[in-house]
Amino acid sequence: MISRLFGKNKAGFCENSRLISFRYSPGYSDMRGAMHSEELTRNENGGWITVCRDRDSHAEPVVVTVYSVSDAAAEDFTSFLRKSGAASLADRRKDDLFATDYSPWEYEMEFDPPRSGSGRRYIRICEYRKYSKRDYALIRELNSRFRAIRGEKISETVEPD
């Protein structure tokens, strides 16, 4: 499905597009409803922020924590996405290992292409693919760089049920 949306050159697409958001979810192996996600996105003033959503179980509310991200850190991360070829990881073949009671880890990149009217594009890198050792090294670096951009805590709220 990803190839149909983007064609075969996802890395080239990323180089010529503007990053809208980047999302990470570590995945879970229990059925209690625990979840965590982090998203690099822009706030209503156009500044970069990281929004983290956490819940321990279905019975608990979601805690939303917002962190600042400097423009320099966001630009450095975006540059890494473009130059590293991370988007090409979405092209890896599907893995035969699949568990229906498990939420896989995933990264999702949202881009706005340079041509107006062509719509936003999403690139998804997920656990159920066949990755090489080199791919896993890139995924570890991607994760490390993403975690490093988070700045000071701006706010923390609890979402109502």
What are these regions (language model features)?
Residues I2-M31, T65, F80-D161:
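Short, well-ordered, aromatic-rich surface patches in folded extracellular/luminal domains
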Residues V51-A90:
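A short-motif feature that recognizes glycine-rich, charge-decorated loops
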Residues R42-E44, V69-D76, M109-S118:
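A short, structured loop/turn motif at beta-sheet edges
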Residues Y28-V64:
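Glycine-rich catalytic cores of cysteine/serine-nucleophile enzymes that process amide/ester linkages
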